[in-house]
Amino acid sequence: MTRQPKITFIGAGSTVFMKNVIGDVLQRPSLSGATIALMDVNPQRLEESEIVAGKLVKTVGSAATIETHSSQRKALEGADFVVVAFQIGGYEPCTVTDFEVPKKYGLRQTIADTLGVGGIMRGLRTVPHLWKICEDMMAICPDAILLQYVNPMAINTWAIAEKYPLIKQVGLCHSVQGTAFELARDLEIPLEEIRYRAAGINHMAFYLKFEHRQADGSYRDLYPDLVRGYRDGRFPKPSHWNPRCPNKVRYEVLTRLGYFVTESSEHFAEYTPYFIKDGRPDLIEKFGIPLDEYPKRCIEQIERWKGQAAAYRSAENIEIEESHEYASSIMNSVWTGEPSVIYGNVRNNGCITSLPENCAAEVPCLVDASGIQPTFIGTLPPQLTALIRTNVNVQELTVAALMTENREHLYHAAMMDPHTAAELDLDQIWSLVDDLLAAHRDWIPEWRGSRKTCRQRKDGTVLVWNRDMASPTPTFSRTGSHDPDRPFGRRLGSGIQPDARAYEPAPVLFDSHLKRQTSGKCSRMVFGAWINPPVSQRRVPSQDVVF
């Protein structure tokens, strides 16, 4: 009998996402007999996911087997594919913190899951857990492919490639195919008649080509139609999924840069210094920018899930609809050798020659029995490279902070963020990062190592990082409020359990009256590169392929 694949879901309590991916998997003959291992640290959500998965199997009449695990290592045993989807810290407290603390400084955000101070903090919370998954994979299933659906995608992908270069990983997002659908809808052209090619970084890739197949087999550039429709007021059409989120920002950027960005307008608005400005409500109104959009979605999704969970429990069968996620396509291509094309986030390694070699790039990838093979793009138009590089700077410094355990680079990352820098001065940026680190102390790693440095804030607090510190006991505190029994951060451990002890203690912040010093050594830095085929051996997708 032919061996069936094992698919492990880490963070299986993300039930709606899990339902979509498993529904896709079960409809593919090559995967319908798979063993599906669900792992989550929340017993209730894990039970709900098991119920949903079981009913999907029943609906399809599949031979798939469903397992549930609270142990990450147990779930990974024998895995061929590892799908990861989770959010560290959830809506409360962490998402609320990421929005409310910056708001005190007049810094407003829309999504805060990719860049900016919200994206930096989310990366700081998330990457250590992804590293622990990679550590367990290297020990238990080193040949498995990691399909990562976690934000901040670019920071996560970059950090995994740096510390675990032998992990076969790809970061997956649905923005490329989702935006193609939106533009096809605006143009009133069937999506299957449109050919496109995009490249850049996650949430800031651009369509380098966007064309319509003609009756004679040739292709016509659709960019003039998009620009004309926007200037005539016909585009964008009202959103078919969220009336709070018109698509005006991206169309405006198209008229300035000549290319359409793949992530939504509400996302893109906070990646640049142009659209969200304190004291400029006219910009918010003109472009329909939905401030605090992500918290609103979280509240709506939490309420919606209450009804969905009850409906899934009572349903005899669960209807399956094909999703637009790439996961099942990748699994099918790797397992059967049947080729497919996806858009994936991988270590650049020269795919985009105008971006750093070690950054995380989003490019077309060919998938077959040999795995996921990024394709060569070359040099992006200079205006796109320049804009993307402003975001790469923030990602690079955040990863540097994580790799070297140097908290100073978190301040540097916020300093370089386009939106933050346009709104706040340097003292405000440093103070904001202080406040966010203090608020997130239960969710972020503790580090031993940072270069020794001191800085005094205007309120008299002195911040100290010392490479030789071994004890994490002293913490950040404003003058007169120091609690020596409160560690700055809680050590992060296996899976997504924030209270297990696995990572090194963090640099800590002292009040000026504290004199405590200890000794120790910084953790060894580990660098590397995910091995892609040499540029000369990479294949470029055929111009006849409709992506």
State each model region's role.
Residues 5-32, 36:
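N-terminal Rossmann-like dinucleotide-binding module
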Residues 32-52:
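NAD(P)-binding Rossmann-fold cofactor-contacting core
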Residues 65-78:
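Short acidic low-complexity segments
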Residues 93-163:
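Rossmann-fold NAD(P)-binding glycine/threonine-rich loop
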Residues 132-214:
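Internal, well-ordered domain-core segments that constitute the primary functional module
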Residues 188-469, 474:
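Long, compositionally biased stretches enriched for glycine and/or charged residues
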Residues 475, 480-485, 494-495, 524-530, ...:
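Intrinsic, low-complexity polybasic segments
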Residues 483-485, 499, 511-513, 532, ...:
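Intrinsic-disorder-associated, low-complexity terminal segments enriched in Asp/Asn/His/Tyr and depleted
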